[in-house]
Amino acid sequence: MDVDIREENNSVVLFFYQMHTQDRSYPTFSSLDLGPVALLNKTDKKISDVEAYETGKNSEEMKRQMSKSNEVEAILYKTNDPTLIARTYFFYLHSDAAVPQEKAGSVEQYSLFYSQPNLGIWQYGNEWFVTHEFDKLLTANNFEFVGYNGKHHVYARRSDYLTLAISGGEYADVNNGKAVMQITVLYKPTVFAGSKEQRLAKVERMLKQYNPKK
């Protein structure tokens, strides 16, 4: 069981998340490949650079989501890889007053979708949990477990605050609606600040969604 403790109005609030024993061993990746990190949060990398990267990978653009101000908000690509089957990019917008203008059009975060979820997560009921094998690979690459909020397992790296939000689910536009593992990649400089509950809430607020669930 995972327990988070928070003081609120002179009272102690406990948050309980049931953790389960892994049912068996699962194979995982031979190495940790987090995709186009070089495109992430870079002021000199814009939508055209993402398009060029995906063209070089022979990917197919599936959908493009526009904002109310008619800016490109997100793009979904289908890859030709049978395991890493899709990537979705989310971009900083000119219309967002909180965004420095030099970042507008740059990649704020991206999500990787895997057709074999058990390479990193396993399912218990309606919940997905990171496998011991994938956790070992993540920690070997200097990622620390930040916490679990019932939906996302969050890991982050102290050296540069690269943050991963790992989840499982079914999406209408990905893998023909079959279950996938989703890893959302972003930078969050304050990811280790505050209580565990506060850290998870900050990451959750940042996460973008593009593909509706089935």
Positions of PLM-derived features:
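A charged, solvent-exposed segment within the mature domains of Sec-exported extracytoplasmic proteins
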Residues: 17, 126-202
